[in-house]
Amino acid sequence: MKRLENRVAIITGGTAGIGAATAIKFAQEGAKVILWARNAERGKAFIESMKAQGLEAEFEAVDSSNYEAVCEAAKRVNDKYGKIDILINNAGITNDSTLKKMTVEQWQQVIDINLSGSFYCIKAITPYMLEKGYGRIVNASSVVALYGNFGQTNYVATKAGLIGMTKTLARELGKKGITVNAVAPGFIETDMVAKMPENVLDGMRAKVPVGRLGQPEEIASAYLFLASEEAAYINGATLSVDGGMTI
């Protein structure tokens, strides 16, 4: 039996990078995969690429920073499948500046999507999990939440906030059959990172004890583990997947 057989999983930001790798892995493991992201054109193209691999998933253009839209989308999923088992809060953006240059708009944009958006998804989906007495919630944090990062006050604040949210909700929901955990990726070789100058990439690799960047599939594997029955006794944890950066 596949590890997510007959599970209904919503993945936010699920059409590129880590989210895309997660969608593929979850579909391979038997989950009914629903992807939420803002870019409809890219979402539809990714669904077609999955079909070409013999995998099924659904896409809906959902802005996770819009609570009403999230609630409506969650209801549609629950109405169709009768349950929502898994939420992977993977959506996130950056908009970097030093404190002196950062505008209030830059701050708020990142807060709205990374932190508020994750809360909105949890708030909207948890009632359906409570109805069934089962749920797996995984939030995407970052290693920078653990040690800070120059020029990323907004981003780091959201990722640290997600760790606090994870621990608090784990206490609230654990006895009701719902576990809440976080994954803190290190330097991951997404398309955006791969376009950086080689000297910058060399500097990034030098900070990682295993001597290389991580792959999106390695973060997807962490999501898969925490969403599976194998992690049933893990709750409120933050799993660092960073090649040893934070030791």
Model regions and ranges:
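Residue(s) in the substrate-gating loop at a strand-loop-helix junction
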Residues: 142
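Conserved glycine-rich cofactor-binding loop
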Residues: 15-17
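Short, small/polar-rich loop/turn modules that mediate ligand/substrate recognition or access, typified
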Residues: 174, 179, 234-236
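Substrate-binding pocket helix/loop in short-chain dehydrogenase/reductase
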Residues: 98-99, 106-111, 193, 204
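Active-site helix of classical SDR
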Residues: 122, 158, 166
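C-terminal substrate-recognition "lid" of short-chain dehydrogenase/reductases
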Residues: 119-122, 130, 134, 212-241, ...
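The beta1-alpha1 cofactor-binding region of Rossmann-like NAD(H)/NADP(H)-dependent oxidoreductases
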Residues: 40, 61-72, 104, 217-218
